[in-house]
Amino acid sequence: MGFRLSKIYTRTGDKGETGLGDGRRVPKDHPRIEAIGEVDTLNSQLGVLLAGLAAAGLNELVAVLAPCQHRLFDLGGELAMPSYQALNAAEVTRLETVIDCWNEELGPLENFILPGGSALVAQAHVCRSLARSAERRCQHLNALEPLAGVGLAYINRLSDLLFVAARLIGRRQGVAEVLWEAAARP
């Protein structure tokens, strides 16, 4: 099956350090831990989005986004164990294919849009912005300790997918996009 965690607490992190999958101990504010934490936060919020999509019967979106939770867990594994590679280019291509398909249905943007219109649209934008934050944390780590594999490309493409997903959710719900209105000029 998979990995089993028989003990949840170890007390080894009580003094501000944590262990990586390769056995190293690092401070809990180490850039690698920051990156892992941002990916974990994104994954948690993606779970909230998926629960809402399932409840709303938006199974097409669930079918595309549910595997992303697993791939984010894979990315976390890659970050925790630098020699471990789980993601591959086919995962990035899968996201690009869906983006192109959904974007063709939606058509071009005429204006900037704001997160909102419905709770699900807003939650998709929360996930998108968290994907960008996770990407920044991963890029910061990459500048210090170069990352192997396609994780950086995956997280970048995932944020694009989540933007397009937000638009598609609105379309499926019959909710108009909230267009940005520039401040009046004095």
Protein language model regions, located:
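Phosphate/pyrophosphate-binding loop motifs in nucleotide- or prenyl diphosphate-using proteins
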Residues: M1-P186
